[in-house]
Structures are given as C-alpha cells and as structure tokens.
C-alpha cells in the first residue's frame, strides 16, 4: 500500500482505506471476542512511556514537576478517549499494515484488535510517521469519513469533534509508541526505530498546541527535543 502512495494517487488509496476501516468499525462489539481499550491499558501505556522513554532512554533528564504535568495531561487525554464512541479497532491501522490487490484494500497485523475509541485507527491512518500530507488534503479525507459514517454507522459527529477525537488519540498513541519502541531498543538493542522518536515528539508538540488543556504537553516536551537529539546522536 505504502509503495503506491503519491500526491496524484493519495485520494484514491485513502478513500479505499476509509471504506475498509468502516467495515471493521461496523463489526459487532462482541466482548467475548474483543477486549476493551480501558483504564488498565491506558495506565499500562503511560507506564511504558515513563519507565522506558523518560527514565531509561532519556536517562531521567526531566524534572519531577514536568513529569507530573505530562501525567496530568495524559489523564485528560485518557478521559477523552474513554468518552468517545466505541467501535472495533485494528489498533495499528497505518499504511504499512495495508495491502492493495485487485482494487481492494487488505489488512495485515490485526491480532491486537479491540473495542476502543473511534479516533484510534483514524489517528494511525492520518498521523502516519512516514507520510506527510497538506492539512487541506487531510481535512477532505476527514470530511469524506464523516459523511460515510453518518450513512453507514448511523453516527453523526461534527467535523470539529471528529478532529478532536483523532488528535487526542494520536497524542495518546505517540505516548504509547515512544514507550514501546524505547523498550524494544533497551531490551533488544534495536536501533532502527529510534530515528522516529523526533517525529513522534514533534507530532505531540504540534497537535497539543491546538488545545488549551493540552498546551502543557507542548510546553513540557519542547525542552526535551534537544535532550532527545543528543541521546540519539550518542547511539548512532
């Protein structure tokens, strides 16, 4: 999928990806099959970030007060996610996990599927680490999705609220990925993904700046950019 994307073809492929995602989101919320994206998972994701990214990878180069600010902001994000409409989530619905064949979209790596917030897979798809699109183009995809779920999921969500859902999910996702990839590096000495860390941090900073209650994230993470770059330079 990722090898087919270009400015000329992006609308076509993202439309297919949206259609396939809505099929997944249309599935029955069967708790006998799918676990829930709940408080326990959110707390676990935070613990990965704090232990492996802050304490170990960055060698705890952050004041306790700054860490507390991040935790309080993370809790606000968590409340937002728990309050969102619930659907079946792939959990990592990014272009690298999509394939294209016979004018159809196929999905890989779906073993972590669960019942979770509607913005979760949209954040994976549109806040991709490897593809960057103009805001105007992304907005047209949001509007495309918004119209389709009103018809296919009988769910009416304003574009402002939909963007908020996606943004909050994307920040939480980046907390999780920073923690998870830091653990992978520390446990297995795999360095191939640490170059993604500045991209993740920049996503968190730029996205949180748009929301008054999340601005402390941006203000707290900005000074860490230099610390992170120095740490990566030492490893490489």
PLM-predicted stretches and their roles:
Residues 34-40, 158-170, 195:
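All-alpha amphipathic helical-bundle segments outside canonical DNA-binding/catalytic cores
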Residues 179-236:
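ATP/Mg2+ or Mg2+-diphosphate-binding catalytic cores
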Residues 24, 75-122, 129-136:
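Active-site acidic catalytic loop and adjacent metal/ATP-binding pocket
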Residues 34, 39-43, 95, 100, ...:
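Glycan-recognition and catalytic cores of secretory/periplasmic carbohydrate-active enzymes
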Residues 47-57, 118-155, 168-188, 200-207:
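Active-site activation/catalytic loop segments of kinase-like enzymes and analogous catalytic loops
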Residues 13, 85, 90, 114-115, ...:
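Secondary-structure capping and boundary motifs in well-ordered enzyme cores
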Residues 1-39, 44, 55-61, 82:
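ATP-binding pocket architecture of kinase catalytic cores
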Residues 10, 14-17, 42, 67-70, ...:
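Hydrophobic packing residues in well-ordered alpha-helices of helical domains and bundles
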């Amino acid at each position: 999928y990722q090898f087919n994307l270009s400015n000329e073809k992006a609308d076509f492929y993202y439309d297919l990806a949206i259609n396939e995602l809505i099929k997944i989101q249309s599935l029955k919320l069967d708790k006998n099959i799918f676990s829930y994206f709940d408080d326990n998972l959110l707390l676990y994701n935070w613990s990965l970030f704090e232990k492996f990214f802050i304490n170990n990878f960055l060698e705890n180069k952050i004041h306790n007060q700054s860490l507390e600010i991040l935790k309080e902001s993370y809790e606000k994000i968590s409340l937002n996610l728990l309050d969102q409409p619930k659907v079946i989530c792939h959990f990592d619905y990014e272009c690298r996990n999509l394939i294209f064949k016979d004018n159809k979209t196929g999905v890989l790596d779906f073993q972590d599927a669960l019942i979770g917030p509607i913005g979760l897979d949209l954040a994976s798809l549109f806040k991709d680490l490897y593809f960057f699109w103009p805001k105007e183009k992304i907005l047209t995809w949001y509007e495309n999705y918004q119209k389709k779920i009103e018809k296919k999921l009988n769910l009416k969500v304003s574009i402002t609220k939909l963007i908020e859902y996606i943004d909050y999910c994307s920040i939480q996702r980046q907390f999780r990925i920073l923690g998870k990839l830091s653990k992978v590096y520390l446990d297995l000495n795999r360095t191939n993904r640490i170059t993604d860390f500045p991209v993740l941090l920049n996503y968190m900073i730029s996205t949180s700046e748009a929301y008054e209650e999340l601005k402390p994230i941006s203000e707290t993470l900005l000074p860490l950019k230099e610390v992170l770059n120095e740490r990566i330079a030492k490893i490489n």
